[in-house]
């Protein structure tokens, strides 16, 4: 039966955590509504408080009806309900990806406020099949083709207990129990590649899906048993990440790793140093690997980073390009700047802005800067890296560059730590 399969999955995924409360993402579609009812049975059985979270993207006319239905259903089940709103700001560029990130940002931020460690989502077997086909079409490497029923976002564990359950079983469960759900009409639109793949798969014989599932399982086993342990060892042996927000890669050790791990290792460093959430495509990393194999020094840019070879070392540091980091007002004690640096204010100082060092600011204060430590650590690349570090300004005046201990008075009013907002399912321990 469906519930027994669900119970087996969720107990294996989080049964030993001893949690007292869990959140669940519900959209109103058949997948998440089925998950809501299944999770409610399990939560009551295990004396766990369930919190229902729903995000209104304000993109469809029926979204308000869906939110109202989910709220009423949660109330009927005796569950706490939270409605969140994603503001797309009338910017429809790359909307699916932005909405996905915004949705997870909103839900995991609320989980942190509610002291909830786990968020359940309704990704089912058909979703995994579609993802595999999409990634295969995009020529993803073996790491990109792999999947997991456990992920992380914003230090919240994302659990997918329906990973081996087909959508048809979820729909049948709802229909049998006379439970209402909503159909998202955008799922029929062929302007989204995923929908086209879904429609093609629906016409295929069952054995085609079974073959894809078998391939997915083999890839996952290969990652778990071979490449994931190698990647963790590779990071420990060959990578040095500096508090100044740059990294060195030992190319002699790097040459001894498998091709799959070399690609993932470069991607790992690009994400950490750039502060971006998503990895670079395999086809964009491959030219860098070719340059490395040529054993010649080079300097290139990729994924918001400068990649520079110096003999047997590869230096990677931030590159802003035309997209400069947002300046942020230090209203609270702490903030994260450029998704990489955590700035702490030690004293109650007003009108503080965290931003980047401009050339004009540098010209004013350059005679007062001591860059010797940064110069030694970065093998002479201190000038370039200096302009990637956070500074603090008050009324347009640079008052602090904490990394190089520059302050315009004797009070050390600010501290900075390198804390990129990134968690990888390949390197995260839980």
UniProtKB/Swiss-Prot annotation:
GO biological process: tRNA modification
Keyword Nucleotide-binding belongs to the record: yes
Catalysed reaction, written as an equation: cytidine(34) in tRNA(Ile2) + L-lysine + ATP = lysidine(34) in tRNA(Ile2) + AMP + diphosphate + H(+)
SUPFAM superfamilies the record matches: Adenine nucleotide alpha hydrolases-like
Compartments, as annotated in UniProt: Cytoplasm
PANTHER family attached to this UniProt entry: TRNA(ILE)-LYSIDINE SYNTHASE-RELATED (PTHR43033:SF1)
Notes concerning its domains: The N-terminal region contains the highly conserved SGGXDS motif, predicted to be a P-loop motif involved in ATP binding.
The family this protein is said to belong to: Belongs to the tRNA(Ile)-lysidine synthase family.
Functional description taken from the UniProt entry: Ligates lysine onto the cytidine present at position 34 of the AUA codon-specific tRNA(Ile) that contains the anticodon CAU, in an ATP-dependent manner. Cytidine is converted to lysidine, thus changing the amino acid specificity of the tRNA from methionine to isoleucine.
Record-given protein name: tRNA(Ile)-lysidine synthase
The gene coding this protein: tilS
């Amino acid at each position: 039966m469906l519930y027994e399969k669900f119970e087996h999955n969720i107990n294996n995924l989080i049964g030993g955590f001893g949690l007292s409360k869990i959140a669940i993402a519900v959209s109103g579609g058949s997948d998440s509504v089925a998950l809501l009812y299944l999770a409610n049975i399990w939560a009551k059985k295990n004396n766990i408080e369930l919190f229902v979270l729903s995000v209104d993207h304000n993109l469809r006319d029926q979204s308000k009806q869906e939110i109202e239905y989910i709220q009423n259903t949660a109330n009927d089940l005796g569950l706490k309900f939270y409605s969140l709103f994603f503001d797309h700001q009338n910017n429809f560029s790359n909307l699916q990806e932005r909405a996905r990130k915004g949705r997870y940002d909103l839900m995991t931020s609320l989980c942190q406020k509610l002291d909830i460690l786990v968020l359940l989502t309704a990704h089912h077997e058909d979703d995994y099949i579609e993802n595999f086909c999409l990634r295969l079409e995009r020529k993803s490497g073996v790491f990109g083709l792999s999947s997991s029923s456990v992920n992380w976002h914003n230090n919240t564990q994302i659990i997918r207990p329906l990973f081996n359950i087909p959508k048809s079983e979820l729909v049948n469960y709802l229909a049998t129990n006379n439970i209402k759900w909503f159909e998202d009409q955008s799922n029929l639109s062929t302007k989204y590649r995923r929908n086209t793949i879904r429609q093609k798969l629906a016409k295929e014989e069952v054995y085609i899906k079974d073959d894809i599932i078998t391939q997915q399982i083999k890839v996952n086993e290969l990652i778990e048993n071979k490449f994931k342990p190698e990647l963790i060892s590779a990071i420990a042996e060959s990578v040095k990440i500096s508090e100044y927000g740059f990294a060195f890669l030992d190319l002699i050790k790097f040459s001894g790793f498998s091709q799959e791990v070399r690609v993932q290792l470069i991607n790992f460093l690009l994400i950490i140093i750039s502060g971006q959430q998503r990895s670079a495509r395999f086809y964009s990393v491959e030219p860098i690997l070719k340059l490395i194999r040529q054993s010649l020094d080079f300097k290139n840019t990729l994924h918001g980073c400068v990649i520079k070879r110096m003999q047997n070392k590869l230096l990677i540091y931030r590159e802003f390009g035309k997209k400069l980091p947002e300046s942020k007002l230090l209203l609270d004690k702490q903030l994260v700047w450029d998704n990489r640096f955590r700035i702490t204010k030690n004293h109650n100082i007003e009108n503080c802005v965290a931003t980047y060092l401009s050339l004009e600011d540098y010209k004013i204060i350059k005679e007062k800067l001591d860059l010797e430590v940064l110069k030694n650590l970065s093998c002479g690349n201190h000038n370039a890296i200096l302009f990637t570090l956070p500074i603090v300004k008050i009324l347009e005046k640079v008052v602090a560059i904490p990394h190089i201990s520059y302050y315009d008075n004797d009070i050390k009013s600010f501290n900075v730590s390198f804390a990129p907002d990134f968690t990888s399912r390949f390197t995260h321990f839980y």
